[in-house]
């Protein structure tokens, strides 16, 4: 597996040749919910303007790009790993599993896969890790948007079920508001029990 850092424009173009799937993840850090990944194969004949790392985009822009990606991309797939799988495997291995599921779910088999970050799982096709790839490679940027919007919407649904936890605001991340909600209301089935704040609450309240 090659890991690319500080790509030149020529390297960036070279990596995007052929039928390439971009892959990114969202949700490694939260205390609750699935880790969500997406795989996207873009159509070179239908360019999408404004793609970037999803964290650098406004929610309104992400939502608009989500619709455009779903409309124009050749293939889009979402893969995930559950809190139970995260607890059993650890977050790194669960993320790799979710990425494999995303690529396996594509309706078109890619010739290669480009993953944001510094490592990739085995996809059965050539794969390369691209550091900060979500800001460099259009297909990874698109995957970043799909994964982010998907997970944020799921946190909104969880917020509707458990409004006292404030998931729509903190998205499950370990914020002061989330810690206070756990202290006041306890741990949910959707919480990741292997993550220290959740584990410590369970140990203190067992």
Swiss-Prot record:
The enzyme's main class, written as a single word, is hydrolase
List of residues binding a divalent metal cation: 24-25, 116
Catalytic function, reaction form: Endonucleolytic cleavage to 5'-phosphomonoester
* The protein's Enzyme Commission number: 3.1.26.4
Gene Ontology terms, MF aspect: manganese ion binding; RNA binding; RNA-DNA hybrid ribonuclease activity
Q: Which GO terms describe its biological process?
A: DNA replication, removal of RNA primer; mismatch repair
Entry keyword Transcription: no
Q: Which Pfam families match?
A: RNase_HII (PF01351)
Where do the RNase H type-2 domain residues begin and end?
18-206
- Is Plastid among this UniProt entry's keywords? no
Q: Which SUPFAM superfamilies match?
A: Ribonuclease H-like (SSF53098)
Question: For this protein, what does the record note about how its cofactor is bound?
Answer: Manganese or magnesium. Binds 1 divalent metal ion per monomer in the absence of substrate. May bind a second metal ion after substrate binding.
PROSITE patterns per UniProt: RNASE_H_2 (PS51975)
Q: Which cofactor does it need?
A: Mn(2+); Mg(2+)
Keywords of this entry: Cytoplasm, Endonuclease, Hydrolase, Manganese, Metal-binding, Nuclease
Q: Where in the cell is it found?
A: Cytoplasm
Looking at the UniProt record for this protein, which Gene Ontology cellular component terms does it annotate, in alphabetical order? cytoplasm; ribonuclease H2 complex
Summarizing the function annotation, the protein's role is:
Endonuclease that specifically degrades the RNA of RNA-DNA hybrids.
Please give the PANTHER family that the UniProt record associates with this protein: RIBONUCLEASE H2 SUBUNIT A (PTHR10954), RIBONUCLEASE HII (PTHR10954:SF18)
In terms of NCBIfam families, this protein maps to: PRK00015.1-1 (NF000594), PRK00015.1-3 (NF000595), PRK00015.1-4 (NF000596)
Protein name listed in UniProt: Ribonuclease HII
- Species of origin reads Shewanella amazonensis (strain ATCC BAA-1098 / SB2B)
Write the gene name. rnhB
